[in-house]
Curated annotation (Swiss-Prot):
Purpose of the protein: Part of the bacilysin biosynthesis operon. May be involved in self-resistance to bacilysin by permitting efflux of this antibiotic.
GO cellular component, one term: plasma membrane
InterPro entries assigned to the protein according to its UniProt record, in alphabetical order: Bacilysin_exporter_BacE_put, MFS, MFS_trans_sf
Alphabetically ordered keywords of this record: Cell membrane, Membrane, Transmembrane, Transmembrane helix, Transport
Primary site of residence: membrane
Subcellular location: Cell membrane
Xref: SUPFAM superfamilies: MFS general substrate transporter
Family matches, as PANTHER family: BACILYSIN EXPORTER BACE-RELATED, MACROLIDE-EFFLUX PROTEIN
CDD domains: MFS_MefA_like (cd06173)
Name of this chain's protein: Putative bacilysin exporter BacE
Membrane-spanning ranges: 11-31, 43-63, 69-89, 92-112, 133-155, 160-177, 215-235, 244-264, 287-307, 353-373
Protein topology in the membrane: Multi-pass membrane protein
Length: 393
């Protein structure tokens, strides 16, 4: 940390605080959505968080033509003002305004990540250090953010958690305003070329079995994430008035992800042992989460679920990185980013359409299909490695 240059420190401090606020406010928003007594509003909260991701792959065209630091600065200011404004909205009233404000906030937020990644690439010698520190800060921020939200709720006001998120965005904007980078506009591809790149990513996914499997994994996990998020308010009711439970379940995201990241090297890549762990954990944890009336069991199930999701996420990314040409990987991840946003939204809507038993049956079929496809791909990977070894001999 001491070796980082000022620009790198400002970016890291601002983003750690901002991320902390994100995971402090998520359960708070789910709690506020329950005051509308309509689960379509709860699903709407998840949808307006995820649907803007569909457009993120095409925003690099605009980001490359503008000052990235200013994009980050004004995005955080807009988000901060909106979240502070949400605290003045009466509970349970004006649902469309509630969702519209969230959509504007998260919609503006999709400009932030491409700009942040571009700024990070300008940090030269610090780029490896800040990427490593950012990954560590992400997990810690989820845990601390959820804990802070829980404390605000115990203090008597869920609105404080929402206000805290607004403040973290404004503090992040302050740090970003201190970043001193020379603005150099880049004439990147136009919108038509961006769509062409997107189509090339789709073509690679369809013709490369390994990349297709990675995409299948990411889409499956996104649907599962949407389902789990939508059930947070229901499961939380098994603990007191249900509000503090949302923060405890959000804490599980960070805790489970931390354990999952640590288990990746032990479970391995492209082998049936890790695949079996992922499949069993995904199905069993979701079944427990959806059907148990005991909150302590739900917490354990949530931790197991997020362990599986972290493992699956790493596996999917590595599968793309190992089996696709470097120049096409960005296009593949662009397609993945858009698909993930759409699938989280779809998963969150299922609670309003079918009951838990039907959702669980769908999940079992989906994860089982992924298991079979991955097993075939792992076999191909093993055969390819054996052939490569024989050639070298």
């Amino acid at each position: 940390m001491k070796q980082l240059k000022p620009n790198s420190k400002y970016l890291l401090f601002g983003q750690a605080l901002s991320f902390m606020g994100d995971y402090c406010v998520l359960p708070a928003l789910l709690i506020l959505s329950t005051y509308y007594h309509d689960y379509w509003v709860t699903s709407g909260v998840i949808a307006v968080r995820s649907i803007p991701m569909v457009f993120q792959p095409f925003l690099g065209v605009l980001v490359d033509r503008l000052d990235r630091v200013k994009i980050m600065l004004w995005t955080d200011v807009i988000r901060g003002v909106i979240f502070l404004g949400l605290t003045f909205l009466p509970k349970g009233e004006y649902p469309l305004l509630f969702l519209a404000l969230l959509f504007v906030s998260y919609g503006s937020g999709v400009f932030f990540n491409p700009a942040r990644l571009a700024v990070m690439s300008s940090l030269e010698a610090d780029i490896k250090n800040i990427n490593t520190l950012f990954a560590k800060a992400t997990t810690i921020s989820i845990i601390v953010g959820a804990a802070a939200g829980g404390l605000f709720l115990l203090g008597g006001s869920v609105e404080l958690a929402v206000a805290f998120n607004g403040v973290t965005y404004l503090v992040s904007a302050f740090f970003i305003s201190r970043i001193k980078l020379q603005y150099v506009p880049i004439q990147s591809e136009n919108v038509r070329e961006a769509f062409q790149s997107f189509k090339e990513g789709l073509k690679e996914i369809k013709t490369n079995a390994f990349v297709l499997n990675a995409m299948f994994t990411m889409i499956t996990m996104a649907l599962l994430w949407g389902v789990v998020y939508s059930y947070f308010p229901i499961v939380s009711r098994f603990l007191g008035d249900g509000e503090i439970g949302n923060f405890l379940l959000t804490f599980c995201i960070g805790f489970g992800g931390f354990i999952g990241a640590a288990l990746v090297s032990k479970w391995g890549f492209n082998n049936n042992k890790g695949l079996m762990y992922f499949t069993v954990l995904s199905i069993v944890s979701l079944a427990l989460f959806l059907f148990t009336p005991i909150f302590a069991v739900s917490v354990i199930a949530a931790i197991l679920f997020f362990i599986a999701m972290e493992y699956g996420e790493v596996l999917a990314k590595v599968k793309v990185q190992e089996n696709a040409a470097n120049q096409i990987q960005g296009r593949i991840f662009s397609v993945a980013e858009a698909s993930i946003g759409l699938c989280i939204a779809v998963g969150s809507m299922l609670i309003n359409i079918v009951d838990a038993a039907v959702i669980m049956a769908f999940i079992v079929l989906l994860v089982s299909g992924l298991f079979l496809h991955t097993k075939l791909v792992n076999k191909s990977f093993s055969e390819r490695n054996n052939e490569s070894e024989q050639i070298h001999l």
